[in-house]
Amino acid sequence: MKTSELRQKFLKFFETKGHTVVRSSSLVPHDDPTLLFTNAGMNQFKDVFLGFDKRPYSRATTAQKCVRAGGKHNDLENVGYTARHHTFFEMMGNFSFGDYFKRDAIHFAWEFLTSPEWLNIPKDKLLATVYAEDDEAYNIWLNEIGMPSERIVRIGDNKGAKYVSDNFWQMGDTGPCGPCSEIFYDHGEEIWGGIPGSPEEDGDRWIEIWNCVFMQFNRDEQGNMNPLPKPSVDTGMGLERMAAVMQHVHSNYEIDLFQDLLKAVARETGAAFSMDEPSLKVIADHIRSCSFLIADGVLPSNEGRGYVLRRIIRRAVRHGYKLGQSKPFFHKLVADLVKEMGGAYPELKEKQAQIEEALKNEESRFAQTLETGMALLENALAKGGKTLDGEIIFKLYDTYGFPYDLTADICRERNIELDEAGFEREMEAQRARARAAQSFKANAQLPYDGQDTEFKGYSERQTESKVLALYKDGEQVNELNEGDSGAVVIDFTPFYAESGGQVGDVGYIFSSENRFEVRDTQKIKAAVFGQFGVQTSGRLKVGDSVTAKVDDEIRNANMRNHSATHLMHKALRDVLGGHVEQKGSLVTAESTRFDISHPQAVTAEEIAEVERRVNEAVLANVAVNAAIMSMEDAQKTGAMMLFGEKYGEEVRVLQMGGFSTELCGGTHVSRTGDIGLFKIISEGGIAAGVRRIEAITGLNALKWAQEQERLVKDIIAETKAQTEKDVLAKIQAGAAHAKALEKELAKAKAELAVHAGAKLLDDAKDLGAAKLVAAQIEADAAALREIVTDLTGKSDNAVILLAAVNDGKVSLCAGVSKPLTGKVKAGDLVKFAAEQVGGKGGGRPDLAQAGGTDAGKLPEMLVSVESWLCQKLS
């Protein structure tokens, strides 16, 4: 049975059982910021199980795309080396939302697996596990299914705590949870391994093929299991594992889907086809996850999901290199994947060209540094030793684009350990250099006396240019070699240099022989732009003809935020008053930060009105026009100008319909609608009369809104509120209750401490004229005071010093019986003690308190009190 046929059979079976076939959700869980990628069939129904969402059906079945790479669920390092680990897999599932429960779930699974009409798997090849306390599921298997008792395994709390078990599922520390029953398939006696729960359970003989989760409890904060009014079912059957069963093979990579992909990998890499070659399996697996991620909108980048994708692509390319393929090949496998899976997932075919282009671009980018990076690594490994130096790991990462786990992958093949601590030191040093980067930016005053730069970036993102000057370590040089950090000056540039609050562009300067990664652009002189970065491959020389290309994604984000800043500036003046003036700004791809003159905090109502006005302008989608004109003509337009700013005879006026007119030399969107969405995320004071506002736009604003929505839903669930309106009342009631409990707890602690203090007095050291108690106990500052007061009141000649440590801080309390205060004062004692533990304090002759910071000095200080007291008494 082919994998595609098995997928269809599963969905058809459950459709005949009254289930609605629901399309796979995206690999990017847009409604759940807690997840990096969709990794289970139930992810898209999470809100249904939690009661936040209601569907028009109570039974559902899906074939869900899943990715496990990065984050908590990360199978990346095992992929290619085991029979069943994948970065991408399909999870078949059937779900009941308060409809059927254990009996039907188990019967459905059994019928699909064993019925001659469906899979017809021999019954004696199957085994079931149940949670040890789930007699209901056990009896269904035994009495209704007819499974022999020796093939029903009870699994208890085998993970170290109550309800922490392979056979007990929970969504989190609180919330829906319940026992589960797993079905295992026996691959035969010739395969090593034992049944679940046995010492040999990790072998490959008995493989889990289906898991039925029975959500029947709601776990509260106290750990109580409260029965759900409508129990639900969440099941999962791994498609690749089941295909291996149906095709009578022992590895997922032997199934038809992977066999065709493996042959395609061998074809494109020129390698011999062999099931013993891990690199073939790595690439076959990775083309699936990479293609599906790109189809769902993820693109290679240096952060978040995009960086996980980049790591997977580069791991695949490296394994191709290992097989002898140094030319781009990975993108050519997309067509083979579309042939295999495009029928079930039409988005693959619809976006085939986009997937191929994204993979080819990333592959080509990495190919330029892969060979030199591998040479560096091979040289380092050839020197011998059991550990690869952290400095080498960092250079591979920083200069050659090797993700840490890619280097780890290579070293694992050679049984070489990684100097992780050394790598982290280098990373921290880089972060420190970044913080000090201003010393190598615009104000570096690099020596230059050549021609000016002609900026083409308003209309062009790519230019053909000539290298006019090169810099390394602040000095002019004739060439930059691979790995060198420096600056490049070219005659025509598309790169915007940092100015007017907008950060400099990034991108690449390259030719067929070399590549320079532009990480910042600054003005060396008023009309001379310096592109700062790293020579990642080849040698760049003065006079070279090169192509200069801006990073489109980052430029577009900068433009959205800059244009939004203009609209916000106008809206702030309209809402707050004409006194508002710009005091500073920072426009980056992530956000816009805007400082204004305003005497008090901007209210929530004022912020909402500013947001409304800006988004109104965005929705109007008016054209954004720029014109060069004389200062006199610019003033006639009513354009806003910054007080104290120096302008030339000619200025650039930026106009956004009737919404904003302002002088600006920055890069901007073509129409206001390109901004997408505008949201202010923070407001606060940074100096007297100056407020700072931070805002985001586009997809960043959408993501922020979704995260806030998710947070509200989580709060509703956590507080068990019925609606959003009830949340505040619930929180206030909870806070009041907690405060009352804290008071009761403090009172109880004080009473206990007083009782414990009585024994301290019994054990006091008798110095003749006084009885001394100097001890460390467990109590807070208030309890210390109560104990000391109680003890000094019970004796005519007691000198008490008690210490406690809470949250790393020292609390001290000294007390002296009143008849003794003529000779010994509590204030003097506590001052003496506090100085030794890094603190100070004082108080009355009979009672004094202090604090300290050095808890390590407590034992020594407590010993010294006796000699101090003896001197006072003598």
From Swiss-Prot:
- What's the EC number here? 6.1.1.7
For this protein, what is any one GO molecular function term?
Answer: alanine-tRNA ligase activity
Instruction: Name the encoding gene, please.
Output: alaS
Where it sits in the cell: the answer is: Cytoplasm
**Description of its domains:** Consists of three domains; the N-terminal catalytic domain, the editing domain and the C-terminal C-Ala domain. The editing domain removes incorrectly charged amino acids, while the C-Ala domain, along with tRNA(Ala), serves as a bridge to cooperatively bring together the editing and aminoacylation centers thus stimulating deacylation of misacylated tRNAs.
Is Protein transport among this UniProt entry's keywords? no
Per UniProt, the keywords (alphabetical) are: Aminoacyl-tRNA synthetase, ATP-binding, Cytoplasm, Ligase, Metal-binding, Nucleotide-binding, Protein biosynthesis, RNA-binding, tRNA-binding, Zinc
Q: Which family does it belong to?
A: Belongs to the class-II aminoacyl-tRNA synthetase family.
Name by which UniProt lists this protein: Alanine--tRNA ligase
Q: What is its main location?
A: cytoplasm
Disulfide feature: none
Task: Return the Pfam families for the record.
Answer: DHHA1, tRNA-synt_2c, tRNA_SAD
The role this protein plays is: Catalyzes the attachment of alanine to tRNA(Ala) in a two-step reaction: alanine is first activated by ATP to form Ala-AMP and then transferred to the acceptor end of tRNA(Ala). Also edits incorrectly charged Ser-tRNA(Ala) and Gly-tRNA(Ala) via its editing domain.
Binding sites annotated in the UniProt record for Zn(2+): H562, H566, C664, H668
**NCBIfam families in alphabetical order:** alaS (TIGR00344)
Q: Which CDD domains match?
A: AlaRS_core
**Required co-factors:** Zn(2+)
PROSITE patterns per the UniProt record, alphabetical = AA_TRNA_LIGASE_II_ALA
Catalytic activity of the protein: tRNA(Ala) + L-alanine + ATP = L-alanyl-tRNA(Ala) + AMP + diphosphate
GO CC annotation: cytosol
Which BP terms from GO are recorded? alanyl-tRNA aminoacylation; negative regulation of DNA-templated transcription
